[in-house]
Amino acid sequence: TSVGEQDVRDVASHSAEGSAFDFADSVLSGDSVSALRLLTKISRQGLRAWGGKRVSIRDAFALLMSAVNSEVTKTAAIIEFMVHTPDLEQAIKASGSRPSKPVISKMQKRLAVCDASHINKINAAILQAEKNLKVEGWRDTTHILEMFVFRVLKRK
């Protein structure tokens, strides 16, 4: 049997990286309910790594922040590109991603609520979360991540 792209996506979506990028997408899409729901799930079950091992939320903090940072960088590049050329497909290519239908759909949803000021707000919240952990010595990474979500909450 052959393994198709969708099969790979299905497996990846249940991996640690998949959950981390789902969290990042929720943050960038302004969906704080989904972001908090994912944190609750991760806190309870951990992130499942490729080998089946579960990674605790404490150990997953860096992975979650890295995924958010990576998606913020891509989204900012797309926003910047679209200022000059309003072609989403070309903007996605310029950001280093492949413009498949799911990617385009996700980015359209994201861009409907995420502008340059929201990107700046997320970057400031990433910095604050890192400061909470590394400088201020907060021990509860679940609390740090919840505060991160509240800081980037998109008000209607």
Where is each model-derived feature located?
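Long, charge-dense, solvent-exposed interaction surfaces that engage phosphate-rich ligands
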Residues: 1-22, 26-33, 44
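Helix-rich C-terminal "collar"/helical-bundle subdomain used as an assembly and partner-interaction module
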Residues: 28, 32-156
